[in-house]
Swiss-Prot record:
Transmembrane segments: none
Highest taxon in the source lineage: Eukaryota
Subunit structure and binding partners: Component of the CSN complex, composed of COPS1/GPS1, COPS2, COPS3, COPS4, COPS5, COPS6, COPS7 (COPS7A or COPS7B), COPS8 and COPS9 isoform 1. In the complex, it probably interacts directly with COPS3, COPS4 and COPS7 (COPS7A or COPS7B).
PANTHER family reported for this sequence: COP9 SIGNALOSOME COMPLEX SUBUNIT 8
Protein name from the UniProt record: COP9 signalosome complex subunit 8
Post-translational modification Phosphoserine, affected residues: 175
Function: Component of the COP9 signalosome complex (CSN), a complex involved in various cellular and developmental processes. The CSN complex is an essential regulator of the ubiquitin (Ubl) conjugation pathway by mediating the deneddylation of the cullin subunits of SCF-type E3 ligase complexes, leading to decrease the Ubl ligase activity of SCF-type complexes such as SCF, CSA or DDB2. The complex is also involved in phosphorylation of p53/TP53, c-jun/JUN, IkappaBalpha/NFKBIA, ITPK1 and IRF8/ICSBP, possibly via its association with CK2 and PKD kinases.
Gene Ontology CC, one term: perinuclear region of cytoplasm
Amino acid sequence: MPVAVMAESAFSFKKLLDQCENQELEAPGGIATPPVYGQLLALYLLHNDMNNARYLWKRIPPAIKSANSELGGIWSVGQRIWQRDFPGIYTTINAHQWSETVQPIMEALRDATRRRAFALVSQAYTSIIADDFAAFVGLPVEEAVKGILEQGWQADSTTRMVLPRKPVAGALDVSFNKFIPLSEPAPVPPIPNEQQLARLTDYVAFLEN
């Protein structure tokens, strides 16, 4: 049976991941239940473990996949992650009605994606159009701008540009309630609107290589 999600913390999610992996290993005939597969697949995505996520998706029996649409929904989120489609990640997560055992994991994944996007923008840009920034962090423009102002960033209402503050190692992210991993990359000059999200996607690829 699936493991109940008791607390939304990094420790509890790691413990839950270990439990789900053990349940799959100990399952009769090596075939786990759909809820266990769902939790395990979502947890691999949460931990950005795309290799294990892909291997798990391949070994889930086709009959279980076809009979449990939630598994396909989780994997569709994984495909957006694989494509580094940040706006698509939020859209796909929000488009599904998740089960109570998967919902907390997907909410944590959405929040982790948002924090990662926030950190990437702070590292990669000296300025970015507010609408593009909002799409990248998956928030309404007004809410996104409010959050960055609380972080000490600047926003120009006339040009609708957001001006990230240069990261300071160990800075606490109050608005998103997490520490954001920071580094000291060279600043990147502004680029045209239509290239913003593509440039951010390329920057993600650069960091991961």
